[in-house]
């Protein structure tokens, strides 16, 4: 896996602090799976 591909994937999964504060850990599962 190239570094650029990893970064673009990471950016797609990125969750803002505000979103996490509002939704809690469940938003991680929605975004990642």
Swiss-Prot record:
Compartment(s) of residence: Cytoplasm, Cytoskeleton
Keywords: ATP-binding, Cytoplasm, Cytoskeleton, Hydrolase, Nucleotide-binding
GO cellular component: cytoplasm; cytoskeleton
Coiled coil start-end: none
Catalytic function, reaction form: ATP + H2O = ADP + phosphate + H(+)
SUPFAM superfamilies: Actin-like ATPase domain (SSF53067)
GO MF annotation terms: ATP binding; hydrolase activity
InterPro entries for the chain: Actin, Actin_CS, ATPase_NBD
Location (main, coarse): cytoplasm
Name of the top EC class for this enzyme: hydrolase
Assigned EC number: 3.6.4.-
Pfam families found in the cross-reference section: Actin
Family: Belongs to the actin family.
Role played: Actins are highly conserved proteins that are involved in various types of cell motility and are ubiquitously expressed in all eukaryotic cells.
Protein's recorded name: Actin
Native source species: Dictyocaulus viviparus (Bovine lungworm)
């Amino acid at each position: 896996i190239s570094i650029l591909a990893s970064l673009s994937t990471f950016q797609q999964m990125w969750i803002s602090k505000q979103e996490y504060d509002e939704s809690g850990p469940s938003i991680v599962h929605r975004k990642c799976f």
